């Protein structure tokens, strides 16, 4: 793998591997992206970066702002990493029955954790995030309703012709199935 100058540029720049064992008698070539090789360890790095960058472009947030988000895991870890890279204070709200490893990963990137009860669940976490925003205690990215979340996958990963896979496979393969 080539050297990449910043963590941000590494997000989504994950290896392509050719799947060797396909069912049936086929000559098709199927490539998979190893999204676990993203810096925070999951495909959620893409939408975390997208939600923050697009909100910056719209002038909704700027470095130094407090971001508040409800999460149960990988998106929170990825947001913690991106927030740290870009200079945001991040408060993550999650149910108290989420794994200790997830909590530790978020805190390792500098996020503050606010726990709600397991009974309140993700709905309670999201309600608290929205209340904190209404009270002026932070800005919510709202991964659950934010179009920049799914668009990150559409723009960078799911499209066969997207820049990341297209650049990696070169001109050896067609750009449409």
Where are these regions (language model features)?
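Single conserved hydrophobic/aromatic residue that forms the stacking wall/gate
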Residues: 160-163, 167-177
């Amino acid at each position: 793998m080539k050297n990449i100058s910043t963590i941000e540029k590494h997000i989504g720049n994950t290896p392509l591997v050719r799947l060797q064992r396909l069912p049936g008698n086929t000559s098709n070539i199927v490539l998979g992206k190893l999204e676990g090789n993203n810096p925070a360890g999951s495909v959620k790095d893409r939408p975390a970066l997208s939600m923050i960058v697009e909100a910056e472009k719209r002038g909704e947030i700027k470095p130094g702002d407090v971001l508040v988000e409800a999460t149960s895991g990988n998106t929170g870890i990825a947001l913690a990493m991106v927030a740290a890279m870009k200079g945001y204070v991040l408060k993550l709200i999650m149910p108290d029955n989420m794994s200790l490893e997830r909590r530790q990963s978020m805190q390792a990137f500098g996020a503050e954790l606010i726990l709600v009860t397991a009974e309140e669940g993700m709905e309670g976490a999201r309600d608290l995030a929205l209340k904190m925003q209404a009270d002026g205690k932070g800005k919510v990215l709202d991964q659950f309703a934010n179009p920049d979340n799914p668009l990150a996958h559409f723009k960078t990963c799911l499209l066969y012709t997207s820049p990341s896979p297209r650049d990696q496979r070169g001109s050896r393969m067609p750009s449409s199935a």
